C-alpha cells in the first residue's frame, strides 16, 4: 500500500502550521493542504519552503474567513466574510465561486510553491455546485483532487475521470483517537493501492482556541502521528509513505 497522510488547515494559524511541520518532520504526515485566506498563510509558506519533502496542495475555502477575490456577494455575509455552513452554496453564483477559487489558486502559485493537489475545507469541493468547477481547475493545473467521498460510489468516481486515490478516510477525527484508531483505518483500506488519510495535527494557539470547534483534539492527533508505535507499525507493514506527487 502507498499511503498519503495529509494534514488539513495548513495556514490556519502559526500553531497549526508548527504542529503540521512537526508531524511531518517527526512523524508520518507526508502532505498538507494550505488555506491561502487565513492569518497563518505567509508563515506556512515559509515553513513549506524550509521542508521541501512535505507535499503541499491547496485547501480551497468557501466557509471560513474572508474571500481572496473582490465582489462575491453570494458567498459572503454582511461583514464581507464567508457564510458559515454549506446551505448557501447551492444558490451561490457559479461565476463568483469560480472567480474566488481561481483567486485562491493564484495566490498559492504566486507564493512560489509547487501545487501537488486540490482538496477543500469542510469538503466543499464535493458539493454538487462546486465539484464541476474544481474538476475544471484540476484539469487546468494538472493536479489530483481529494477523493470526493460525498459524491458516491467508485463507479461514479470513475465516470468523473479525475486523478485521485483509490481510498480516502476522514475517520481519523474526534475525541477518542488512539494509535489503534489510525491502524484500524489503514487495515480497513488494505485492498486499495493508494490511500489518503485526512488529519488535523496542531499546537494550540489563540486562533485555534477561539476560532475552531476542533481544538484540543488536534494536539492528540499530533501525539499519535509522531508516536514511535505508529511509525513502527508502518515500517513493519511495509507501507510506503508518499505524497500526491506520486500519483499518476
UniProtKB/Swiss-Prot annotation:
It is an enzyme of class 3 (hydrolase). GO terms for biological process: polysaccharide catabolic process. Signal peptide: none annotated. Its cofactor is Mg(2+). SUPFAM superfamilies: Glycoside hydrolase/deacetylase (SSF88713). The keyword Metal-binding applies. Mg(2+) binds at residues 59, 121. Keywords: Carbohydrate metabolism, Hydrolase, Magnesium, Metal-binding. Pfam families: YdjC (PF04794). The keyword Magnesium applies. Its EC number is 3.5.1.-. Belongs to the YdjC deacetylase family. PANTHER family: CARBOHYDRATE DEACETYLASE, YDJC DEACETYLASE FAMILY MEMBER. NCBIfam families: PRK02134.1 (NF002559). Probably catalyzes the deacetylation of acetylated carbohydrates an important step in the degradation of oligosaccharides. This is Carbohydrate deacetylase. It comes from Brevibacillus brevis (strain 47 / JCM 6285 / NBRC 100599).
